[in-house]
């Protein structure tokens, strides 16, 4: 409406959610959930295959006051407030950490598309989906959780596993067995942030994720 075009300057439907409050709020629960969802979104983008696309200011929670098309807003709505870098230091550090993970693990930025096949005859495909059972992706249409295993064999790097739980309930993910001598370590999550030192998982067969959480594991 602020653009003065009767909402004709973009699609009518927006894939968005205010987390329980419209606009600015002081409710800690809403603010914490918004922060978690921003981190989840960055994990989805930066750990996906292909070239990640990020709008300037996303890394420090620039909201444009809910306006997703600020082409005509030469004002505070469309400008970037760089002072938010200090206020959103935690989110900014998380995004930088995710970028470092993407660059540090070849499975997240291969030169060729992963095929879901065992290209090196190592016994596992280069990428595979998992759920509560290993090697079995959730089949329900309403499912909001998925585990993705990346084999490092093709690129001679470490195996990785990313568990996505977008549900409002906790879920358990089965972990694929690693080659002899290797263990799963947590390297980051949208709940704990980027870990300075990888933590060995006590349970090497499964991992439980809290609601609306993404966790990244490395096999080493």
Question: PLM features: residue spans?
Answer:
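Carbohydrate-interacting/catalytic domains
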Residues: 22-39, 44-220
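Alpha-amylase-like alpha-glycosidases and glucanotransferases acting on alpha-linked glucans and related
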Residues: 1-30
